[in-house]
Amino acid sequence: MSPEMGELTQTRLQKIWIPHSSGSSRLQRRRGSSIPQFTNSPTMVIMVGLPARGKTYISTKLTRYLNWIGTPTKVFNLGQYRREAVSYKNYEFFLPDNMEALQIRKQCALAALKDVHNYLSHEEGHVAVFDATNTTRERRSLILQFAKEHGYKVFFIESICNDPGIIAENIRQVKLGSPDYIDCDREKVLEDFLKRIECYEVNYQPLDEELDSHLSYIKIFDVGTRYMVNRVQDHIQSRTVYYLMNIHVTPRSIYLCRHGESELNIRGRIGGDSGLSVRGKQYAYALANFIQSQGISSLKVWTSHMKRTIQTAEALGVPYEQWKALNEIDAGVCEEMTYEEIQEHYPEEFALRDQDKYRYRYPKGESYEDLVQRLEPVIMELERQENVLVICHQAVMRCLLAYFLDKSSDELPYLKCPLHTVLKLTPVAYGCKVESIYLNVEAVNTHREKPENVDITREPEEALDTVPAHY
């Protein structure tokens, strides 16, 4: 066998074949060389911008979104590394001539980059969000060199804001509660933080259209009033841009609820397209009274194409919009069956679903993973809107709730979304405030916990142990 046809080694994460390392590749490994960058290489998303420009807000939301669509993503917040290294006293730590502090900050950046490498190359991560100011060309060059050496793609997100009102609101909402300012006087916090911003302004070098024309980036001006996008390289970067151009910070609430109890719910049958039960109709009117009591301005109402959500919305007496994407998960051959019937006719399928409920796909039907992909346009539109009431179904509501509450794929299929209960979601600084409102109309329980025994050879009694009661 010729040297050129030597052993091939598959890289576990990139799923591609590269020549096995040998003595002849010494030149390729010399200092300053880089790993080849492939189409599906891991990506580093690098935040850029002065303090109080919403970088951590963007990092958190983007990470939540990418994880939800199935792209393993993690935030590396440099402020946390700095707080672990040294306790914060005041803005003087960030003075450009504080050489001791500069060295500490650089060491923190290197420690964070080491963790980024471990995550992307050894923990099966695909996107690392490097959340820091990264305001100098020197710091960005350090990151670019690091990415080149490890074969990572780089995408910059720069948040630029010159509106004093927006900056002040960001400081009020986020920085006053920062670990740097625990138990500090409000006015002193504001004064110190504004001086910290001034320290960064001295050496701030924004991404430049000419000098950085070879880089991939998006510049966001004044919380989304204007955008500049340059050299988007791949699918992940294009989805990132699309997502960032849809989010906003306008105060609003999203109301999630299921349809009223249906005739098939009462009988313990999944799926189907039945109408509301007597109690389901009572709930529809209770929902109308609740929504009216909230005094919500410009409320939009969305339903699926299914009879039970439409009947629930009709009681509101307001215009509503039907989304096919909001239809319940397709149970395929198991549509309109009870869990007992599924266990009787398809015991192996029933066990396989219990083993991996998120990825299991019903024969001729869908999985929760499929449902998440179907619901992505709904999430995008929810991010664009202000006040919305979504009347949907159990599996659909679980997927939407998992997005807003940052739940993993293992947790998602078991989130509790009871009938006749409204969840009010109000976005806050780095997450979502949840209020659960039960509207005092009884309904059957449709929630089935994961049974202890998920083996295919289990007894029927073990398989049906967590099935809720029904008529």
From Swiss-Prot:
The keyword Ribonucleoprotein does not apply. Keywords: Acetylation, ATP-binding, Hydrolase, Kinase, Multifunctional enzyme, Nucleotide-binding, Phosphoprotein, Transferase. Phosphorylation at Ser-33 inhibits the kinase and activates the bisphosphatase. Residues 2-250 are annotated as: 6-phosphofructo-2-kinase. The modification Phosphoserine is found at S33, S141. Beta-D-fructose 6-phosphate binds at R82, R105, T133, R139, K175, R196, Y200. One of its GO terms (cellular component) is cytosol. It catalyses: beta-D-fructose 2,6-bisphosphate + H2O = beta-D-fructose 6-phosphate + phosphate; beta-D-fructose 6-phosphate + ATP = beta-D-fructose 2,6-bisphosphate + ADP + H(+). One of its GO terms (biological process) is fructose 2,6-bisphosphate metabolic process. Residues 251-471 are annotated as: Fructose-2,6-bisphosphatase. The modification N-acetylserine is found at S2. Beta-D-fructose 2,6-bisphosphate binds at R258, N265, G271, R308, Y339, R353, K357, Y368, Q394, R398. Liver. Synthesis and degradation of fructose 2,6-bisphosphate. Homodimer. In the C-terminal section; belongs to the phosphoglycerate mutase family. This is 6-phosphofructo-2-kinase/fructose-2,6-bisphosphatase 1. The gene is PFKFB1.
